[in-house]
């Protein structure tokens, strides 16, 4: 009788362990950013914020919530509000704030973050 209880218990534990699943999240592969090639703000960085992908400009527009991320004002806004830290680029708020609790839908992709980080490391030029 005791053996059947042990077998039953082992079978139940086996079923319970098989019921648990975990979906592995595949990490995004980063295309290497060549630090010797200048990253252009106007064509590579600004579109991340001004395109409709994250809908940043639905709130962050002229007369709306700061910073003003419209095409004409995005560079000045990022600098005026000190969202770019050229001393410690990885600590720049422009990298750490999107994706926070108040902006959970706006998480930058790993490749976008890497591109912005490299641009800041290159001096965050308005080119």
Language-model features: locations:
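Aromatic- and Gly/Pro-enriched helix-to-coil junctions and flexible linker segments
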Residues: 20-127
């Amino acid at each position: 009788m005791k053996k059947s209880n042990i077998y039953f218990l082992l079978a139940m534990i086996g079923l319970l362990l098989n019921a648990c699943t975990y979906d592995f999240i595949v990490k995004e592969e980063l295309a290497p950013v060549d630090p010797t090639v200048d990253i252009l703000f106007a064509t590579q960085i600004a579109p991340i914020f001004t395109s409709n992908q994250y809908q940043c400009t639905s709130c962050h527009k002229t007369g709306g919530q700061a910073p003003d991320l419209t095409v004409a004002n995005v560079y000045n806004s990022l600098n005026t509000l000190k969202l770019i830290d050229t001393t410690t680029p990885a600590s720049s708020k422009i990298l750490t704030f999107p994706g926070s609790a108040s902006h959970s839908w706006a998480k930058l992709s790993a490749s976008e973050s890497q591109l912005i980080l490299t641009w800041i490391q290159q001096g965050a030029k308005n080119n």
